[in-house]
Amino acid sequence: FSTRDLYYYARELFRHQRYDDCLKYLNKFIKRKDKYIEDYIDACILQSKVYCIKKEYQIALKCLFDTFTYDIPRVNTLIEIANIYFNSYDFDKAIYYYKLSLNSLKYYKNKGFIYKDYLGYYQSLSLCVCYFYLKKYKKAFYYNELAHKLKNDNPFYLPNKNAINKYVNWKND
């Protein structure tokens, strides 16, 4: 396999839920020197996803942090880190990485592929939920409104707003 073939083969193995084989080929790819940085970063993210499926979250985090040795942290990498903490109910750490991903958007130009929702909407919606769980309802409200501004067809906006309003007395707070 060429270096690039290793990467694409590993992605196919992932799509077919052959996770152990996927990791084997991702590791071969990552050890190669002649790879494009964005492919390396994407391979580390894919490795992390496999380890999350296997419920090996510390290894998943290490895969994501390894990307920092190649270049500045990517928005999608920071979101993946935040998601691991979010799914572990470690909302303070999730908040840190979601906010860091928002702040890193200014460095985004020409730094790989990014999902449209990762340009602020996803992070804002996730921050809303984090703050809601931490009972910081005004911050949850703020980020829900921001998510709505960024994507006004957001299906979560009204349910979130109604849930938050049940806990906030806007006149006395």
Label each region the model flagged.
Residues 2, 40, 74, 113-120, ...:
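Residues that mark the junctions of alpha-helical repeat units in TPR/alpha-solenoid scaffolds
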Residues 19-20, 57, 91, 137, ...:
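TPR-repeat structural position
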